Each structure stands twice: as C-alpha cells, then as structure tokens.
Amino acid sequence: VVGRGGMGTVWRAYDEMLDRDVAVKEVHLPERITEAERKVLCRRLLGEARATAALRHPGVVAVHDLIVEDGRPWIVMEFLESRSLHGLIAECGPLGVRRAAEIGADVLSVLRAAHAAGILHRDVKPSNVLICEDGRVLLTDFGLAVHMDRGREAGETLVAGIEGSPAYLPPERVNGLPSLEASDLWSLGATLYTAVEGFSPFLRCHALASMLAVLLGDYARPERAGALTPVIEGLLRQRPEDRLSAEATAMLLREAADLAARPGATALPVAAARPGAG
C-alpha cells in the first residue's frame, strides 16, 4: 500500500505485459450499499480517470487504464516514488518560505491547466500534493473533480453537497454553493498556510467546528509565512470575487520565492496582494 484516501487505497503493482511498476487505485465500497450508490461511486472514479487523463501536464499522474472487475473499477496509473506534502510536514515540520512558494507554484500550474480544460479539482489539500524524489510536484486524487460545462448542463456535482476535507473547503462550498475556479485557489491558500505554519488554519476539534471557522474566516495570521503572507491572505478572502486571480497568485509566488532566497527576507506589503479578475 502506497497511499490511502477517503475514496480508496492505492497499491503498488507490477505490469507483467509492459514490464513496469504501476500504481493501482482500489475503490472503497461501503459494506451496505445499494446498486444506485455503487453506480455513483463507479461514475465518480470514471470521472477521476477521465479528468486526470485529459490533462497533459507534468504535475498530473499519468493514467494508463481503467479496469472494472466484479462491478468494481480500478484505475491503473503511473507509479512514482513520492510522499505527500502532509507526510513531509508531519515528518520534517513546516517548510521554508522558498520551498513552500515553489511547491505552491507547481500546484497552481496544475490548477491553471485543469481550469483551462474546464475541470475543477475541488479537493486541494496537503495529502493530495505529492513530492517526488526527483523534486517533481504533483497534484493527485481528482476524485471530486468535475467538468464545469458538463456539471452545469447536467445540474449535478457542482452542487453535490459538502464533500472533501472540512478544513480545506472554501466558504462557498460549506454554504452548499457551486464550486468555482476561485474555490480551488482558496484551498491552495489553506494548503500554503499549512506548509509554512505546520498546521491547517481552520482545523478544529471536529468537522462542524472546522466548517464554522471557514465560514467566519477565523484563523490566526501566519507567523512563519514571510513573503508568502500576502499570497495566503489574498487567497483566503471570504468572497470568491475578492480573492487573488491565478495570474496574480503566480506572480506573487515567484516574487515570494525570490525574496525568500535573499538574506534578511521580510514579507511583502499586504497591499501588494490585490484581487484580480482572472
């Protein structure tokens, strides 16, 4: 076993036909499940496979195949020696500002590619960010992903109830409103906060308390973020239209990484974190 998530377990396996290691995602099916519910889960996994396969990006794990056996689907994917950002923080503690900014820029690059393809990730969090041994950064687990156009046309999934990790759900999702591109960016902001501070800004003793903290914008100002402070605070704004755009975020992440590399680095002025239209 190389990973576990809310939807399934990822196993390391060997492809005898092509002589290569692969990762195989097994879906967790509840013990008592109706046929209709099983179909929903299978459809979600198929959606994940299609969403991932549609993205030609170095920050996305390649999908090799989708197999259905005894009514249960499995995704066969590229295997990479890696560990999650969550695991890295748990083992080594908070990241430095420069490294966090670089990882954030890589995750943002995947999100921009996904958004350009009409796909929302909807579950950006440290456990879904993988750091490979060669330094490559990947955004994985598109299990809650939805295609924006198809979701709106079908009238489903975009308002599919509250799913995901409560501490990384943006306010509009907690309120049961549709996901937006800005929703993924908010979750990126919460992930960056966790990377530099070592804990989630909205994690509380139970899920409802976490969601209430999200709705109230109740989090402590980051103390270790340095030059990332305006990025984090700009992404965690309550209203989607007030958040930093992807373009502004990319620019500020580059500036933060450059500034953090200099001796005596300090945070950029908060005024620099302006919301953008894109």
Residue spans of the language-model regions?
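Activation segment signature within eukaryotic-like protein kinase domains
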Residues: 103-104
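Protein kinase catalytic-loop region centered on the HRD/HxD motif
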Residues: 107-119
